[in-house]
Amino acid sequence: MPNKKISVLLVDDSAVVRQVLVAILNDTPDIHVMGAASDPIFAMSKLAQEWPDVIVLDVEMPRMDGITFLKKIMSERPTPVVICSSLTQKGAETSLQALSAGAVEIITKPTTGLKNFLIDSAAELVAAVRAAANSNVRNLGKRTAAPVLNPASKLTADAILPAASGHAMAQTTERIVAIGTSTGGTQALEAVLTALPRVCPGMVIVQHMPEKFTASFAERLNSLSQIEVREARNNDRILPGLALIAPGGKHMMVTRSGAYYHVQVIDGPLVNRHRPSVDVLFRSVAKFAGKNATGIIMTGMGDDGARGLKEMLDAGSATVAQDEASCVVFGMPKEAIKLNAAQRIIPLQEIHQAILHR
């Protein structure tokens, strides 16, 4: 028997958005739109008849806002939710609230040129729905079917930075930690960073997230943590007690000047279909930090970071992968484990200890 299609409920007050998203998703062989609603009140009437595998949800709607609806869903029947948000500061902040409330993915939409943008972003939407369908949301049963990845060709970290020549630079007194994550990473990073004391190694983090969202995300983590957390700026020095988060839409690399590590924030093509890319970050850490670094790959769909973690291991870094039981999506860690890139496989609640102790 063929695998069951992923059923999707769309909730958005824009008729244009609903029309385009229904067409895109229903044109995808493994996805079926079981309903579309103009607001959460209509959505609840549809949920009374049939429950989907995934909900695609706008956050700014009449009668009931998306956050209130999301919290209601998560309290009654936890379900993977993809947030469809505007590319505005308010949209970013509201979407981060949604991620904290249990949403697993964000896709963005502009304020103008909406129809063409959504059509151009069809692959991103489909990938987000597939990632959500394969996520483990709280006590949601895990799907047995593997996610269907986009077979289109993708660039590797070679497009940004050549691999290390075989000899990592000599160890310094400063140890650094590089972290890569995607789907489910916002909640996972919050759990890890808020568990750290003020005195800890400097960190560089790639979280797959749209442009304009990472600054708000960093501000939120900073307000919750004892350490300092902020969006990275070009040439920032990596310091103990500081976590630098790669800006959405940019790659972040580590470089070294004397005994000190800095970051470079650069433009460049998508790597593994992402910008920022975990592989780009990890490769730079392997090249410039080697034995003086720890690499940690956490929850997320796909394979971004798997090869980079192996390069870090080969350069002498300590390497860690999050275990399947604590992942929202066991994709990136799974691919790293397949490559024998992880020295240790540990649950989320132990990752802060891996940061503190090599």
Curated annotation (Swiss-Prot):
Post-translational modification: Phosphorylated by CheA. Phosphorylation of the N-terminal regulatory domain activates the methylesterase activity.
Organism per entry: Pseudomonas syringae pv. syringae (strain B728a)
GO MF term (any one): protein-glutamate methylesterase activity
Gene3D superfamilies xrefs: 3.40.50.2300, Methylesterase CheB, C-terminal domain
A cellular component term, taken from the record's GO annotations: cytoplasm
Lineage, opening ranks: Bacteria, Pseudomonadati, Pseudomonadota, Gammaproteobacteria, Pseudomonadales
Localisation per UniProt entry: Cytoplasm
Reaction it catalyzes: [protein]-L-glutamate 5-O-methyl ester + H2O = L-glutamyl-[protein] + methanol + H(+); L-glutaminyl-[protein] + H2O = L-glutamyl-[protein] + NH4(+)
Protein family (similarity comment): Belongs to the CheB family.
SMART domains per record: REC (SM00448)
Gene: cheB1
Pfam families reported for this sequence: CheB_methylest, Response_reg
GO process terms (BP): chemotaxis
Name of the top EC class for this enzyme: hydrolase
Active site: S182, H208, D304
Protein name: Protein-glutamate methylesterase/protein-glutamine glutaminase 1
Domain remark in the UniProt entry: Contains a C-terminal catalytic domain, and an N-terminal region which modulates catalytic activity.
Residues with the 4-aspartylphosphate modification: D58
